[in-house]
């Protein structure tokens, strides 16, 4: 049986309404989330039995794509509609034809690495593979990783 997939690219399509897309017989949808960041609204409305491919890798050479952003995109899409990671993919947002070959390869390596990280078996493993500032509120606030203070028995912190 053929897998029907619809690619939505080039800008925000959320104003067309969810039914425009999800009343159609597609099994999965690829959304450009760089040119169309409001497409997250469509992803949030997508039925949980439909696959979602997050086009979250910026196609321009001048941008740096931290893996944490791609991992967040995968996990957020997985959390919508009870979808789960088995129905989520990561992709470049649009063509990489406008950048040189080595930059395109580097972006594709990053995309593959982010997919590997997003598939971590446990939350602890996921946290270990990411920049601590992305998963630890204290580190995010400080702008650097700092272990939390040790706690003494009875709940009081050591200073």
Regions found by a protein language model. Give the residues of each.
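Short beta-strand/loop segments at the ligand-binding rim of alpha/beta enzyme cores
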Residues: 1-9, 52
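N-terminal active-site wall of soluble small-molecule enzyme domains
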Residues: 1, 13-20
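Catalytic-face loop-and-helix region of soluble metabolic enzyme cores
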Residues: 20-125
